[in-house]
Every structure is written in C-alpha cells, then in structure tokens.
C-alpha cells in the first residue's frame, strides 16, 4: 500500500545523492539525455510547466534553459531545499516550489499547465494509486498539452540485474524473489532493502494510459544499449545518438531501466 510519508522520508534521507545520481556514471548520463531529448521535442519556450517529482533540479535547469516557466513540486521537503540551492541561477524561471504528492494535485486548477513533466520514480512509488496519479497529472494539463512521464521497467530491470537473482532466490525462495516480482512488478521491502516500488511492462503502462483522456504520442526505453557497454559510450559519444534511436524502437521499449511516455491530453 502506498505510504507517502515513507517516500518523503526516503528522499529526505537520500538527500544530495539524488543530485549526483543522474551524472554518476555513463548509464545515468545516457538516461538523463534520453529523458531530456523528449521534453525538447514537446515543451516549448514560454510554456507553463509543472515538474512533479522534481528532485534537486537537474531537469528543471534544462526546462529553464528552454525558456519554460516552471512550478516545481516534490514530496520531499529536503529535495526542495536542495532544489533551491542548486537552481539559484534560474530563479527567474521558477514561479514557486511546493511540497506536493502526485496523487493529489488539488492545489492546482484544471488545465492550468501547458505541459507536465513527471520523470523518474513518482508513478512507480505510488503503487496501487498509479491511476489516481495519472488522472491528476492529466487533469492539470490543458487540453492539447503534453504529459511526459516515466516509470521503472520490469523486464529491463530483470535483464540488467539478472546476476543478483540467484542470491535472492537462495535467501528468499523462488516465489518471493522471482515469481512475485515477475507476476506483479512489485519489489517488496523484503527483497529490496526496505524499499517498495512497482516496475512496469510497456503493455501495462500503455493500458493504464489508455484508461485516461489522452492519446499516446511517443514512447521510449532508457538505457537499452548502454548497460554492459559503458566503456564504449565513454570512449565515443556518437553511441549516444544510436542509443536514443534504438530506445524508440517498439521492440526495445521493455528493454531499459525506465520506460518513458509522452501523451497528449484530449
């Protein structure tokens, strides 16, 4: 069951590491670029943008450089404090920073934003309330505007972290360590160091989005090629363009660490 206080505490304690996470290694840097390229396609200068689950502001800096006007929201007060510290150079682009939960955006009016960006973990962390979160994110997006979101990928994560599973099976048994994860996408606290989140197949994300007033415009994996090939990406930046192209192939959508989707509010 979704526990917003737990998520807030987790990210309060995670602190500065969230700022470093997106640049700490080639995999994270490639993921950042894949996500960033999509909002460069669907957010334009002058747009009023809600960034829901902003963290300390890596994506905010990019949105500001594009000329967007940004309302910053995060469930973690500590992440918002870091955000204020890390984004002082773009303060004129930020209308406000607010503590907010993606399942309840009632402080905002219907159709208030030209675009909404919800990248990273928020949809995966709200567990059984994911539909509520999508409904709220779309409600505050104007008709014809875009919602850009990402979730953590089930199939891709199993593929990438496969070497961990034998030890998990030895400790927790097949049904809990593998069977439950594959069937439900739920990473429980027992096998994930106290951390609970939901991983998605592309089919599951697509079906959820199709229950709401929107149409899917674009979809992408993140980190389809780079995992296990980090050295090549470090040595030759041209691989980045191949990664971005490969991630958008239909057959690749389930193969990365995240699944990114762009939908248009109808």
Could you describe each region identified by the protein language model?
Residues 1-44, 58, 62, 148-179:
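Conserved class I S-adenosyl-L-methionine
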Residues 58-104:
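Class I SAM-dependent methyltransferase SAM/SAH-binding core
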């Amino acid at each position: 069951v979704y526990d917003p206080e737990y998520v807030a505490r987790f990210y309060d304690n995670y602190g500065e590491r969230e700022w470093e996470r997106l640049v700490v290694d080639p995999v994270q840097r490639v993921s950042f670029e894949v996500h960033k390229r999509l909002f460069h396609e669907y957010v334009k200068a002058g747009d009023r943008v809600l960034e829901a689950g902003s963290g300390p502001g890596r994506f905010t800096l990019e949105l500001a450089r594009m000329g967007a006007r940004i309302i910053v929201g995060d469930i973690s007060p500590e992440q918002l404090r870091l955000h204020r510290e890390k984004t002082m150079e773009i303060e004129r682009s930020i209308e406000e920073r607010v503590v907010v939960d993606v399942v309840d955006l009632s402080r905002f009016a219907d159709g208030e934003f030209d675009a909404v960006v919800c990248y990273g973990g928020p949809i995966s962390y709200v567990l059984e309330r994911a539909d509520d979160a999508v409904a709220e994110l779309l409600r505050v997006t104007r008709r014809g505007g875009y919602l850009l979101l990402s979730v953590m990928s089930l199939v891709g994560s199993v593929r990438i972290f496969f070497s961990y599973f034998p030890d998990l099976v030895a400790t927790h048994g097949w049904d809990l360590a593998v069977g439950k994860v594959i069937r439900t996408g739920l990473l429980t606290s027992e096998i994930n160091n106290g951390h609970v989140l939901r991983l998605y197949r592309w089919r599951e994300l697509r079906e959820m989005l199709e229950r709401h007033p929107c149409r899917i415009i674009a979809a992408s994996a993140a980190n389809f090629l780079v995992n296990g090939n980090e050295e090549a990406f470090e040595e030759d930046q041209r691989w980045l363009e191949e990664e971005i192209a490969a991630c958008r192939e239909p057959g690749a959508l389930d193969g990365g660490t995240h699944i990114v989707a762009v939908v248009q509010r109808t």
